[in-house]
Amino acid sequence: MLSWEFPPRTVGGIAPHLFNLSRELVKLGVEVHIVTCDFPGAPETEVVNGAHVLRVDSYKTPSPDFATWDSLMNVNMQKETAALISSLDCQFDVIHAHDWLVANAAVGLKHVFRIPLVATIHSTEVGRRNGLHTDYERMIHQTENWLAHESWRIVCCSQYMFGQVRWAFGLPEDRMTVIPNGVDVSIYQKEFDRAEFRKRFATPEEKIVLFVGRLVYEKGVQTLISAIPKILSRVNAKFVVVGDGGMRDSLTRQVGNMRLAQKVMFTGFLDEDSLRKLYQIADVCVVPSLYEPFGITALEAMAAKTPLVASNTGGLSEIVEHDNTGTKVFPGNVDSVAWGVTRVLLDPGYANWIKLNAYQKVLQVYDWAKIAKQTKEFYEQVLKVYDAGSWKPT
């Protein structure tokens, strides 16, 4: 598996996806090697839950832009992975690339070693940007398109992404499959002093409204911030915003201009243990995304038995059933978000109903063991075609 992020480097949803998927694949007897980017303090090589992890130099010398840095990182990733493949007694069966950031290395390795390449497209640039407006965005789109067409098969995390990838890259349906993301329910079952931990974020009288995600436009946090006055007019609440990103300064100014600094806490990134606990003490988790290929934050809230308010968009629409496993609101609509949050906070019976239903859905559909089994079967389908063809080296 090739990915630019893997714990402790966690930028988005790919890192936890690989961490959990690799663990469960190992349990099924799959030998997993993960090649990823280095991170301060993390060892160059280690075994994590049975998966072999190799971290390659990310070229920390100054680069003119992120794309140049990524290209340099891919050069080293391809070189180090090639050395790894050559040093092993056994041949890798499949190369699994995760998103465009590792496309150059993945495609190069595919052709050098004649190993089938598959890719998980976690999101698309045209979806993230609501179109392609700059040369930089078009470059990313073209790289995604190249990776998609070089791959034997494509994995999408939702039916929504299946449709978007097919539309964006013109792929036939028989080269694509849907395997959802998952969540580890067990981490939300550890006991801790909830009252003591809660003091870090709110007073006993305040309800906790939680947002977790990158502070970028498509995640819709600006909609939630704008809805705060309407929510506070009916409920005494504290808004905890977990994550970082390019919009943090503007959001902080927005909160200051609204004179709500005492009601909004920007935590930045939190360690996994603190985030797990925060999900469990929150009274509601809000996922107000404008664009969302899947919505791992929604799954985490459901696994923690936290009532969920989510935008009716993208993959979220498949995860959340309105009035059953959560409350759906219109994306980008301040009044709708305020209504959804207020409804959950003012009706404890309703909140309890949706959170328990959501938890059961997680157990039935989004268990990592089931997802790993689907992934292994997907690999076996690819290998069956590969073994029957003429591309395999003799």
Where are these regions (language model features)?
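Short alpha-helical donor nucleotide-sugar binding micro-motif in glycosyltransferases
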Residues: F269-L270, K277-A282
